[in-house]
Curated annotation (Swiss-Prot):
GO BP terms in the entry: asymmetric cell division
Lineage: Eukaryota, Viridiplantae, Streptophyta, Embryophyta, Tracheophyta
Sites bearing Phosphothreonine, chain numbering: 19, 84, 86, 193, 217, 233
Assembly and interaction partners: Component of a complex made of POLAR, BASL, ASK7/BIN2 and ASK3/SK12. Interacts with BASL, ASK7/BIN2 and ASK3/SK12.
Protein name (database record): Protein POLAR LOCALIZATION DURING ASYMMETRIC DIVISION AND REDISTRIBUTION
Length: 344
């Protein structure tokens, strides 16, 4: 409830707003003034009706009547004074009561709005707490399941862990065995070195055309020796078998199976290498027999050729470091430095 009053100043209008208390006070004062005027008019009418003058009969009676009227007026004034005092006190107290009532109404409305806000905040907080509890329960359920099961792992995780542990253990054991093998140098290792040296010597004796094949065989033989060394090292590895009832295969059993597979493959490769070695040995024997045949043929020819024809030839001694080349008949050829051979 608001009222306004306009005032005109220097070419502009100024609007003055009243407070609710002032507006209610002015409204109540207007009502009181109109009510007071009505009451005063009614009292005057009553007085005129009560105190109408009687017809004048004589002078003495007039004086008496005037005295009586004055007395009655004094009495009436005395009786009206407390009534006016009570009315003024009531008129002063009524705007205060109205203002207090309006203020109380305003407080009630404001408190209601605040209570509504508080209820909304309470509902929001309850929803937030419920969501937080649900999230915490969801996070705690996998941890509780792991604790209840005694930290059980899934099969995939266990297989990954087993493979990693197996690799680490196998690498450490192999390193230890290799170090022991290098320090001890068993007889198998020495035999392998002897084989390599013999093969190198035989390959040096072969002619130039067959050196490519001999290189391949040499490479295969070296691989064979390495595989034998690996077999020796694997024979020293301790076989440890640990049975696990929860899961299917133990890592040590897997290690054993892998070693068996490797051994079978290595044996197959060894068989192939042995066959290749046998072929090379056969070829070497054939070449040696051919060389011996050529030597025998040369001796026979030397015995049968007359001395006059042998004068033009100078034989190359295999023990001598140098060999002189001279004119040789077309049907014969001199050999290289280290051995002699003739071809027709």
């Amino acid at each position: 409830m608001e009222g306004s009053r306009r005032r005109r100043g220097d070419g502009c209008t100024i609007v003055q707003c009243y407070t609710p208390r002032r507006f209610v006070g002015r409204w109540l004062s207007g009502l009181r003034s109109s009510k007071g005027k009505r009451d005063a008019g009614e009292e005057q009418e009553d007085d005129t009706r009560r105190y109408q003058l009687a017809p004048i009969r004589c002078s003495t009676s007039l004086n008496q009547l005037v005295m009586q009227d004055n007395k009655q007026n004094c009495r009436l004034n005395k009786s009206k004074e407390p009534e006016t005092n009570t009315f003024e006190s009531q008129s002063r107290e009524s705007p205060l009561e109205v203002g207090i009532g309006s203020f109380l109404l305003y407080l009630v409305v404001a408190s209601k709005t605040e209570l509504d806000k508080m209820t909304n905040l309470r509902m929001q907080m309850e929803m937030f707490l419920l969501n937080a509890k649900e999230q915490l329960q969801k996070k705690d359920t996998p941890m509780s399941s792991n604790e209840a099961s005694g930290f059980q792992f899934s099969p995939q995780e266990f297989s990954n862990l087993a493979s990693s542990i197996f690799q680490e253990s196998s690498s450490s054991v192999l390193q230890e065995e290799y170090t022991e093998f290098e320090v001890s140098e068993p007889e198998d290792y020495r035999r392998g070195t002897d084989c390599n040296s013999k093969l190198q010597a035989e390959v040096g004796r072969l002619p130039l055309g067959e050196k490519a094949e001999d290189r391949q065989t040499k490479h295969q033989i070296q691989r064979q020796c390495k595989l034998k060394d690996n077999e020796v090292t694997k024979s020293h590895i301790p076989e440890m078998v640990v049975s696990d009832e929860r899961y299917g295969v133990c890592p040590y059993e897997l290690d054993k199976k892998l070693h068996e597979l490797l051994e079978t493959r290595q044996q197959e490769e060894l068989v192939k290498l042995e066959t290749a070695l046998n072929r090379v040995e056969r070829r070497l024997q054939e070449k040696e027999t051919e060389v011996s045949w050529w030597k025998d043929a040369a001796r026979l020819l030397a015995q049968r050729v007359p001395e006059s024809s042998r004068s033009g030839l100078e034989w190359c001694n295999p023990d001598s470091s140098t060999c002189s080349e001279r004119s040789v008949p077309r049907s014969y050829e001199a050999c290289s430095i280290h051995r002699t051979s003739f071809s027709r």
